[in-house]
């Protein structure tokens, strides 16, 4: 693959960024994220319409994450020599098909099939996103392009639930997914128009994905990714009970806190390219260290609403650096195997999200209200130490 990348760069060196293609990728990512979380705000009407409980309907989110984890691991092995332009178009088609299957679902099994299609698109798209980006812009512009893509993620995360809830009341949950299918069609046409041909890896250069973990610093990097995202979900999954019981926020106050977090996350993502240009390793070590301190502050003084709100804003600003930073690390330190590294990264993140939420929930129920914070802070501190000591970083 390294020879293949080198040959392509030599023959087709990128001198000007293809921003139209980058924005089409960002739009596709935003659509994937919005559709992933639409059921969260539509569970009740979906459950009532299909004659199932809300808990069972909630598995429509779980199955997407589960399929995405496995899709991310095996998609790069499956699409080796395929032009990545056609692969991205396929993912957009799967996104659209998923929405239509869910919209017309008359049984829980058809609903799950639709959501599984989304999982394949979600996991596959994230697996190739870093390598895709580095083939659309010059090396010096990669952090900026990644910040555009992750900025779209931040916006999608902020608007997905309230938009789904509002439109669900207005036009019904099935028509919400029909509207999402229309967005998928727009994705397809935009990608067809803007994304250039991006040849895949020749079949004779296939390599085992997991051999990457034998490279110096790669295993440490993946462990650091796991701990940082597990730390995030150990806390953020339970931000509602923590903020309502520790700081005394009501529903309206919590909504404003979450909105502030979302806006801060978008701002942090927008500023990430400037910070990462200075030092990727400093950002990847510094961000979790700041989050560890924030968890400590919230544990000690979180009963003060001003302090709690400030921590939420700082958390949103700071954590935004982490996903962009690790994708930048892949494009620089593992550029010759960016797709395979991306597939491992996505699987690690999905596993971390699941483990972080599960362990955080156990701690909340069995240890105490601030235990998710202490768990999160500990994981973030360990991440900062591991990055500082073991993670290797190549200069751009």
From Swiss-Prot:
It is a multi-pass membrane protein. The chain crosses the membrane at residues 22-42, 55-75, 86-106, 108-128, 148-168, 176-196, 216-236, 256-276, 282-302, 306-326, 344-364, 367-387. It catalyses: inosine(in) + H(+)(out) = inosine(out) + H(+)(in); guanosine(in) + H(+)(out) = guanosine(out) + H(+)(in). GO terms for molecular function: antiporter activity; purine nucleoside transmembrane transporter activity. It comes from the Bacteria. Pfam families: MFS_1 (PF07690). Coiled coil: none annotated. The keyword Cell membrane applies. InterPro entries: MFS, MFS_dom, MFS_Efflux_Transporters, MFS_NepI, MFS_trans_sf. This is Purine ribonucleoside efflux pump NepI.
């Amino acid at each position: 693959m390294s020879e293949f990348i080198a040959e392509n760069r030599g023959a087709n060196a990128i001198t000007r960024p293809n921003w139209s293609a980058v924005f089409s990728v960002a739009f596709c990512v935003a659509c994937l994220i919005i559709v992933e979380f639409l059921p969260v705000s539509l569970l009740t009407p979906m459950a009532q319409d299909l004659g199932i409980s809300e808990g069972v309907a909630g598995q429509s989110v779980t199955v997407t994450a589960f399929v995405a984890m496995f899709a991310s691991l095996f998609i790069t092995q499956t699409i080796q020599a395929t032009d990545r332009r056609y692969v991205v178009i396929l993912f957009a088609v799967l996104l659209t098909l998923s929405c239509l299957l869910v919209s017309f679902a008359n049984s829980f099994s058809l609903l799950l099939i639709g959501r599984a299609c989304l999982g394949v698109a979600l996991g596959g798209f994230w697996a190739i996103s870093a390598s895709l980006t580095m083939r659309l812009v010059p090396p010096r512009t990669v952090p900026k392009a990644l910040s555009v893509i992750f900025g779209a993620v931040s916006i999608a995360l902020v608007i997905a639930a309230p938009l789904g809830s509002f439109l669900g009341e207005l036009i019904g949950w099935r028509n919400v997914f029909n509207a999402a299918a229309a967005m998928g069609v727009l994705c397809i046409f935009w990608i067809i128009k803007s994304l250039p041909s991006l040849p895949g890896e020749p079949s004779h250069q296939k390599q085992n994905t997991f051999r990457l973990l034998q490279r110096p610093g790669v295993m440490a990097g993946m462990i650091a990714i796991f701990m940082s995202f597990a730390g995030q979900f150990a806390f953020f999954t339970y931000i509602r009970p923590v903020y309502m019981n520790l700081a005394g926020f009501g529903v309206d106050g919590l909504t404003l806190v979450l909105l502030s977090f979302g806006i801060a996350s978008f701002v942090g993502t927008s500023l990430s390219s400037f910070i990462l240009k200075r030092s990727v390793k400093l950002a990847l070590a510094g961000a979790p260290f700041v989050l560890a301190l924030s968890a400590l502050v919230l544990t000690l003084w979180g009963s003060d609403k001003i302090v709690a709100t400030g921590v939420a804003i700082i958390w949103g600003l700071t954590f935004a650096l982490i996903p962009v930073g690790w994708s930048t690390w892949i494009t620089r330190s593992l550029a010759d195997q960016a797709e395979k590294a991306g597939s491992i990264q996505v699987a690690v993140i999905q596993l971390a999200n699941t483990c972080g939420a599960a362990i955080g929930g156990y701690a909340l129920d069995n240890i105490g209200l601030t235990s998710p914070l202490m768990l999160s802070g500990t994981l973030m501190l360990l991440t900062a130490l591991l990055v500082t000591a073991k993670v290797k970083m190549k200069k751009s």
